[in-house]
Design a protein with these regions (language model features):
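Extended redox/cofactor-interaction regions of prokaryotic respiratory oxidoreductases
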Residues: 2-3, 173-260, 267, 285, ...
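Long, well-ordered, tryptophan-enriched scaffold segments
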Residues: 263-367
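Active-site phosphate/pyrophosphate-binding segments
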Residues: 323-324, 328-442
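Phosphate/diphosphate-binding loops
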Residues: 497-498, 545-564
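Catalytic or ion-translocation cores adjacent to nucleophile or general acid/base/metal-coordination motifs
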Residues: 520-545, 755-756
C-alpha cells in the first residue's frame, strides 16, 4: 500500500469495503456508519473533488457566477456565488436555474465532438467526420478564393450573442476573435444594429444623443414606476440581473408600479399595482392620449420644455420645420393630420379604456419623481423607432429627465467595471448593412442601396455575401425571421458559397454549415467576464477550465490561430502577436490594472473567482450633468438639447425611399403598420402574434435541456375569449399559421394575454422536415415572423405578425 493510499489511519481499500458493508446495513435499517468511517469517507470525497469558478455567459444580460464541483474530470454538481454578506448593494450573484443546469449542457449527449463537413443538402443535418487539418485547410482555401474572386466585402461575420460576456470567447461580431482575424486579412462586411435593440438604439439618439437611462436601484427615490413592456423577471431574473434590485428598491420607496404590456408577465406577477393590457404596436398612441391630458390639464413642465428641449411648441421649433410642425400641435390636432389625440382616440387604438388613460395621465403628471421606462419588446415592432421615441415623451413632458428617481424613458442603465477586450483592430472594409438584412445581401446584395436598404459607407453594395462565419450563434436560422424563406436562400449554394459554423451542438443553424467545428464552452477555458445589467454593483468573474479538453473540441482562439497560419505567416503574427490565450488575458488584465489600480491582481482575482464593486456614486442618473448645466454639458444632438423635433429625421424622411405604409417622422408620432391591429389582413389572420423571452431559455441557449423543457413547455398563449371561439381548451394541440409557415404546439388558454393577441416564447429549436411539409413541431416563433425590416433602423420587427390558430 503506497503512502498516497493511506488517509487518517484507514486505507482506501478498507474504506470502500467498510462503506459497502455500512450501506447494506443502512438499507436493512440495522445501524448507521460509525462517525470515524463517515469522516474518512468525507475526506476521500474532498480529496478527489475540486471547485472551479465559472460563469453563465449567455445573452440574458446577467452573467452569473457558477461554482462547479469537479470529480474525476467530470462536473458532478453546480452551485452559485456564495461570497460576501449578501446585502442589498453587495449581494451574491446567484445564477438562475438555467445557469445551474449547465452540467447538463456540458455533458449533453448531443455535444459536437469532432470537425465535420456537410455531405447532404444544407439544412438536412447530414455530415461526416473529418480531421482538423482538412477542416482548417478547407476554410482557409475557401476564404482565399472568396477574397480573390469577390473581395473582402463578400465575407460576413454572422450576428451572434451566444457568448456575450467573454473576453477571448466573446461572440458578438464587432468584438469577437473572428473579427480580429478578418481584420488581419483585409476585413469583412460590417453590420450595425442588433436583434435585441435595433429600433430603440437607432431612434433614441435622435432625441437624446444616446440611449441612457437611470439605474434600477434609483427607483428607491421614485414615487411612481411605469414599465412599458419591460419584463426583467424573465429576461434578467437572476442575481446578476435587476429583478432583485427592482424589488429591493421598491421596498425602500414604496413606489406604485404600473405594468403596460399585452401579456401579464412574471415581472407583474403580484409585484405590480396595476396591469394595463395593450394591443401590440400601439404604445405610441397611448402616449399621445396621455400627452393630450397632460397638456389640457396643465400638467406639463413648461419651464423644462422651454429650457432643455427643441420642438415642443412654436417657441422652440427649428427654423427649417413647417408651421405647426411641433409636438403640441400634433397632439392637439393642429398639425397635418388634423386629428386631436384625445383619450377617446387612443382608446380605440390601444384597447385601454378612456377613463384609465385619463387616470394614468394624471398619475404621471402629479407623481414626481416618476421612473418611466421601456423594455425592448415594444421597439421590436415595425413602428418600433416611433414607439421608442414616443415613450420617452412622458418623462420629457413632465420634467423627469436628469433627476434622481426619474428616468429618460429608456431601459435601465447599469454600473460596470470596464474590461479590456481582445482588440479587433481596424476593418479596412468601411461598408456596413443592418444585421437583419444579411439574407437580402446574399440574395440580391448589389441591388441594396443606402436610401432604400440602409447600406452605410457607400451608395450600394458591390457584391453579395459569399462566405459566412457563424460562431456561437443561432441567428443563421432559428433566431432570424421567416425560416422557410431563409432556408430557400441558404440552401442555394450558388448564392452563399461557404458557411463555417463553430458550435457546441447541432443547432438549427449548424445544420446549414459546410464546415462544422466543435467549440469549447466558456466554462471549459480560461477567460474573464464582467457583469452586464446589474444595477449599481459591478463585478468580474475569473473562469478557469472546469475539465480538460475532451474528444477533439477546441477553443475559438486556437481554431482561428490555425486558420491564420494557413492564410500566411504575416496574418498569423498579426493575429496572435505571439501570445497564447492565457498570455492575452494576462496582457489585457495588466492594462486594466494600469487604468484601475483598485482591482485585485491577476493572481488574486484568479483565486477569488469573483470580485464585486458598488457604484461609488450610488446610482446612475441619466443626463444629470445636462440637467444641472445644459450649456456646459450639452447632449450629443445637433442642437445640444433634447430634440422632440429632429431636423435630421425630417431630412431622412424627405430623401429615403419608403413604402407607402412606412413612416419616418421628425416627431414621435403614432403610425399604423403592416400586419398591425388595424390591418386588412386580419380578416384572414385575425390574431396578433408576438414572441417573448422565455425563462427556460436565453434566446435558444439551453433550449435543448430536457429538464428545462419539461418545467416550461413550449406553448402558444391565447385568451379564453379567442380560444372559446375556436373550440380550443387548455393543453390542446393547435396549429398556428400564416402565409409564411405553420407551427404545431400545445395551447395555453389564459387571461394573462389580451383578447386578439397571441404569444410564443421565442428561442424554441426549429424542428421541421424541410424537404417535406416544413411544418415546425419545435414551436419556433420565427417560422411565422416577417423578414420585412423596420423603416429607419432596418431592424427586425419580429413582434409584428398576424396568424390564425386552429385546433388539430
Amino acid at each position: 500500500m503506497s503512502k498516497n493510499e493511506r488517509m487518517v489511519g484507514i486505507s482506501r481499500r478498507t474504506l470502500v469495503k467498510s462503506t459497502a458493508i455500512g450501506s447494506l446495513a443502512l438499507a436493512a435499517g440495522g445501524f448507521s456508519l460509525p462517525f470515524t468511517l463517515r469522516s474518512a469517507a468525507a475526506a476521500v470525497q474532498q480529496a478527489r473533488e475540486k471547485v472551479v469558478w465559472g460563469a453563465c455567459s449567455v445573452n440574458c444580460g446577467s452573467r452569473c457566477a457558477l461554482r462547479l464541483h469537479v470529480k474525476d474530470n467530470e462536473v458532478t454538481w453546480v452551485e452559485t456565488d456564495n461570497t460576501g454578506s449578501d446585502e442589498y448593494g453587495n449581494h451574491q450573484v446567484r445564477a438562475c436555474l438555467r445557469g445551474r443546469s449547465i452540467r447538463r449542457r456540458i455533458n449533453h449527449p448531443d455535444r459536437l465532438n469532432y470537425p465535420m463537413k456537410r455531405v447532404g443538402k444544407r439544412g438536412e443535418g447530414k455530415f461526416e467526420r473529418i480531421s482538423w487539418d482538412e477542416a482548417l485547410d478547407t476554410i482557409a482555401s475557401s476564404l482565399k478564393k472568396t477574397v480573390e474572386q469577390y473581395g473582402n466585402e463578400a465575407v460576413y461575420i454572422q450576428y451572434s450573442s451566444g457568448i456575450v460576456g467573454g473576453n477571448m470567447t466573446r461572440s458578438s461580431p464587432s468584438a469577437s476573435a473572428v473579427k480580429r482575424l478578418m481584420n488581419c486579412y483585409g476585413g469583412s462586411l460590417n453590420q450595425y444594429g442588433s436583434y435585441s435593440t435595433a429600433q430603440i438604439s437607432c431612434a433614441m439618439p435622435y432625441t437624446y444623443g444616446s440611449n441612457d437611462g437611470n439605474s434600477t436601484t434609483d427607483i428607491e427615490n421614485s414615487k411612481l414606476v411605469v414599465m412599458f413592456g419591460n419584463n426583467p423577471a424573465e429576461t434578467r431574473m437572476s442575481g446578476g440581473g435587476i429583478t432583485y434590485l427592482l424589488e429591493k428598491a421598491r421596498e425602500k420607496s414604496n413606489a406604485k408600479m404600473i405594468v403596460i404590456d399585452p401579456r401579464y408577465t412574471d415581472t407583474a406577477a403580484g409585484r405590480e399595482d396595476e396591469w394595463l393590457p395593450i394591443r401590440p404596436g400601439t404604445d405610441a398612441a397611448l402616449v399621445a392620449g396621455i400627452a393630450w391630458v397632460l397638456i389640457n390639464e396643465n400638467l406639463v413642465d413648461q419651464p423644462f420644455l422651454d429650457k432643455y428641449c427643441v420642438g415642443y411648441d412654436e417657441k422652440t421649433l427649428p427654423a427649417d420645420a413647417p408651421k405647426n410642425g411641433h409636438y403640441k400641435a400634433y397632439i392637439l390636432g393642429e398639425g397635418d393630420d388634423n386629428t386631436a389625440k384625445t383619450p377617446q382616440w387612443a382608446s380605440q387604438i390601444t384597447g385601454i379604456p378612456v377613463d384609465r388613460i385619463i387616470k394614468l395621465a394624471r398619475e404621471i403628471g402629479t407623481a414626481k419623481p416618476a421612473y418611466i421606462c421601456q423594455g425592448w419588446g415594444p421597439q421590436r415592432q415595425a413602428n418600433g423607432e416611433l414607439t421608442a421615441r414616443a415613450i420617452a415623451m412622458l418623462p420629457i413632458l413632465t420634467g423627469n429627465v436628469g433627476i434622481s428617481g426619474g428616468n429618460s424613458g429608456a431601459r435601465e442603465s447599469t454600473y460596470t467595471i470596464t474590461i479590456e477586450r481582445l482588440p479587433v483592430l481596424d476593418n479596412p472594409v468601411k461598408t456596413s448593412i443592418s444585421c437583419f438584412s444579411w439574407t437580402d445581401a446574399i440574395d440580391h446584395g448589389p441591388q441594396m442601396t443606402a436610401i432604400r436598404d440602409g447600406v452605410r459607407g457607400k451608395d450600394k453594395l458591390d457584391v453579395p455575401i459569399k462566405f459566412i462565419w457563424n460562431y456561437a450563434g443561432n441567428t443563421l436560422v432559428n433566431q432570424h425571421s421567416d425560416i422557410n424563406k431563409t432556408h430557400e436562400i441558404l440552401q442555394d449554394e450558388s448564392k452563399c458559397e461557404m458557411i463555417v459554423v463553430i458550435e457546441n451542438f447541432m443547432t438549427s443553424s449548424a445544420k446549414y454549415a459546410d464546415i462544422l467545428l466543435p467549440d469549447l464552452m466558456t466554462v471549459e477555458q480560461e477567460d474573464i467576464i464582467p457583469n452586464d445589467y446589474a444595477g449599481n454593483m459591478g463585478y468580474l468573474i475569473f473562469l478557469q477550465p472546469v475539465t480538460s479538453e475532451k474528444f477533439e473540441r477546441k477553443p475559438i482562439y486556437w481554431i482561428l490561430s490555425e486558420v491564420a497560419k494557413r492564410l500566411g505567416p504575416d496574418v498569423y503574427q498579426k493575429f496572435t502577436e505571439g501570445r497564447t490565450q492565457e498570455q492575452w488575458l494576462q496582457h489585457l488584465y495588466a492594462k486594466m490594472l494600469a487604468k484601475d489600480p483598485a482591482l485585485p491582481s491577476y493572481d488574486e482575482l484568479k483565486k477569488m473567482g469573483i470580485y464585486k464593486r458598488k457604484d461609488p456614486n450610488g446610482h446612475f442618473v441619466a443626463y444629470k450633468a445636462f440637467r444641472d448645466d445644459p450649456e456646459a454639458n450639452p447632449l450629443k444632438t445637433p442642437s445640444g438639447k433634447i430634440e422632440i423635433y429632429s431636423s435630421k429625421l425630417a431630412e431622412i424622411a424627405r430623401t429615403w425611399e419608403l413604402e407607402k405604409d412606412e413612416v419616418i417622422s421628425p416627431l414621435p408620432v403614432y403610425a399604423s403598420t403592416f400586419e398591425g391591429w388595424d390591418s386588412p389582413e386580419r380578416r384572414t389572420f385575425p390574431l396578433q402574434l408576438f414572441g417573448f423571452h422565455y425563462k427556460s431559455r436565453t434566446h435558444s441557449t439551453y433550449g435543448n435541456i430536457d429538464l428545462l423543457k419539461a418545467a416550461c413547455r413550449q406553448e402558444v398563449w391565447i385568451n379564453p375569449i379567442d380560444a372559446q371561439k375556436r373550440g380550443i381548451a387548455n393543453g390542446d394541440m393547435v396549429r398556428v399559421f400564416n402565409h409564411r409557415g405553420e407551427v404545431r404546439l400545445p395551447a395555453k388558454v389564459t387571461p394573462r394575454i389580451l383578447p386578439g393577441g397571441s404569444a410564443m416564447g421565442q428561442g424554441a429549436w426549429h424542428e421541421a422536415n424541410m424537404s417535406g411539409d416544413k411544418i415546425d413541431h419545435g414551436g419556433c416563433v420565427n417560422t411565422l415572423t416577417t423578414l420585412r425590416p423596420s423603416p429607419l433602423a432596418k431592424g427586425n420587427p419580429q413582434h409584428t405578425n398576424l396568424v390564425e390558430i386552429e385546433k388539430i
